């Protein structure tokens, strides 16, 4: 890792702020952040993170990390009239830490290369608590030399760093990860409803499931920490965001000629949860519509 690197970070939301904090405190590098909200910038200033008033102030960055809500936001920040493509120097690397369409990742790679700027998709998985602890799983799509340059920085935010292949492959794997997670949470919601209806203590049931072949990350986290407690905060991965990611998965399924009926069922349940007013709630709230 080059100790003279300048790092930019755009997007300080639920995951972005703790990732930015870890990157700053662990790397010792000069780090400048951009967000439309004042509060996270003020908090991060306490650990030495500078603030950019506009994207133009990212011009001196050697690496720029993005943690944005969706592909449209990523496209705007990268390719807009005052976007990164207009300000970054040759040799800079742009890294998308969020979940965006595979096709967009490959388009951005092509567009940035016209300006001798490199691009990598490196979407993160796990929870906000993992972002705070620096124990995220990060799935990287990049050519080998770009991955090698980024890996030391990524290890300051995550503990499991997987080079999935070329640009776009990180997004593809992350989208499949989320599709499987959403279907698992939906299955847990069904089990919870059936168990309650049949008169069993849900806590006893989930504890027993965790000791058998039904054990999973989703059971131990989304199931035990949210669904059992019937607690679905607004400062977590919302139903709206889950619906967005599931849409990316179904788009990929259509591209390869697969119906993906399980994912379609979960999409309908997310739609029901959103219609019931749970759009901003932590997505395991889907249990309330089953």
Regions found by a protein language model. Name each.
Residues 31, 51, 118-120, 161, ...:
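Hydrophobic beta-strand scaffold residues
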Residues 169-290:
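Helical "substrate-binding/catalytic lid" subdomain
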Residues 1-66:
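NAD(P)+-binding Rossmann beta1-loop-alpha1 motif at the extreme N-terminus of oxidoreductases
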Residues 7, 99-178:
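Rossmann-fold dinucleotide-binding core
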Residues 55-67, 71-118:
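Rossmann-fold NAD(P) dinucleotide-binding segment
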């Amino acid at each position: 890792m080059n100790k003279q690197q300048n790092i930019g970070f755009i997007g300080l939301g639920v995951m972005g702020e703790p990732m930015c904090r870890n990157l700053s405190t662990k790397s010792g590098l000069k780090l400048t952040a951009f967000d439309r909200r004042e509060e996270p910038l003020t908090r991060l200033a306490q650990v030495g993170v500078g603030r950019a008033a506009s994207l133009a102030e990212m011009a001196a960055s050697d690496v720029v990390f993005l943690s944005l809500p969706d592909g449209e936001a990523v496209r705007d920040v990268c390719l807009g009239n005052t976007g990164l493509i207009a300000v970054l120097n040759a040799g800079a690397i742009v890294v998308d830490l969020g979940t965006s369409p595979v096709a967009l990742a490959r388009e951005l790679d092509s567009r940035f290369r016209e300006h001798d700027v490199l691009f990598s998709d490196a979407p993160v998985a796990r929870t906000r608590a993992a972002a705070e602890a620096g124990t995220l799983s990060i799935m990287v799509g990049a050519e080998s030399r770009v991955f090698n340059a980024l890996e030391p920085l990524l290890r300051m935010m995550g503990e499991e760093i997987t080079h999935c292949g070329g640009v776009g492959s990180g997004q593809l794997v992350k989208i499949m990860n989320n599709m499987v997670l959403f279907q698992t949470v939906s299955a847990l919601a069904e089990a919870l409803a059936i168990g309650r209806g049949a008169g069993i203590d849900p806590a006893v049931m989930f504890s027993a499931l965790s000791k058998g072949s039904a054990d999973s990350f989703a059971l131990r986290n989304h199931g035990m920490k949210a669904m059992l407690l019937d607690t679905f905060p607004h400062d977590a991965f919302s139903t709206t965001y889950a619906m967005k990611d599931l849409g990316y998965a179904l788009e990929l399924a259509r591209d390869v000629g697969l119906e993906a009926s399980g994912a379609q069922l979960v999409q309908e349940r997310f739609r029901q949860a959103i219609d019931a007013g749970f759009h901003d709630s932590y997505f395991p709230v889907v249990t309330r519509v089953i």
